[in-house]
Design a protein with these regions (language model features):
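Conserved ABC ATPase "signature" region
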Residues: 51, 63-80
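Helical segment within the ABC ATPase nucleotide-binding domain
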Residues: 123-136
Length: 168
């Protein structure tokens, strides 16, 4: 449901917002992908943004160097690495962000409607990647308006309405 507080909840969990009450305990490296293009500089190329986003997540240049080809290959944006991100479509930004966030091997991955844009083929590929991450013990929190997608991917789900939990 729109306006239910889903994105706000993910921002609290990832530390972007402070909770008005209580606290959030996290254990392990967390990688949030909260807004389309968040963490990207639109003036920089795709390649430059891979290193920028990696640095923002706390990874060294050497580490990103070792993962660069894997990021580019998964994103399927080889021909666009030297193009400024301001010229990317929303689907291309989603591909790049998702590819970076998943290749750095977080313990907790937070995705806010990232899989709602782009083509069906890449969504399916991304869902397969998420399933393999589950198998390796990664916790994935994601927002989706697609009940079918939630049923395919999740072993637990919750529904929010106006900031209240109405189903778990």
């Amino acid at each position: 449901l729109n306006g239910a507080g889903k994105s706000t909840l993910l921002k609290v969990i990832s530390g972007v917002f402070k909770p008005t009450e209580g606290h959030v305990d996290k254990h392990g490296k967390m990688v949030p992908l909260l807004e389309l293009g968040a963490g990207f500089d639109p003036q920089y190329t795709g390649k430059e943004n891979i290193y920028l986003y990696g640095a923002m997540l706390g990874y060294t240049k050497k580490f990103i160097d070792s993962k660069y080809d894997e990021i580019v290959e998964f994103s399927e944006l080889q021909k666009f690495m030297d193009v400024p991100v301001k010229n990317y479509s929303s689907g291309m930004k989603s591909r790049l962000g998702f590819s970076i966030a998943t290749v750095v091997e977080p313990k907790i991955l937070i995705l806010d409607e990232v899989l709602s844009v782009g083509d069906a083929k890449f969504r399916k590929k991304s869902e397969k990647k998420i399933m393999s991450m589950f198998d390796s013990g990664v916790t994935v929190l994601f927002v989706s308006h697609s009940l079918e997608q939630v049923q395919r991917l999740c072993n637990k789900a919750m529904i929010l309405e106006k900031g209240k939990l109405i189903a778990y």
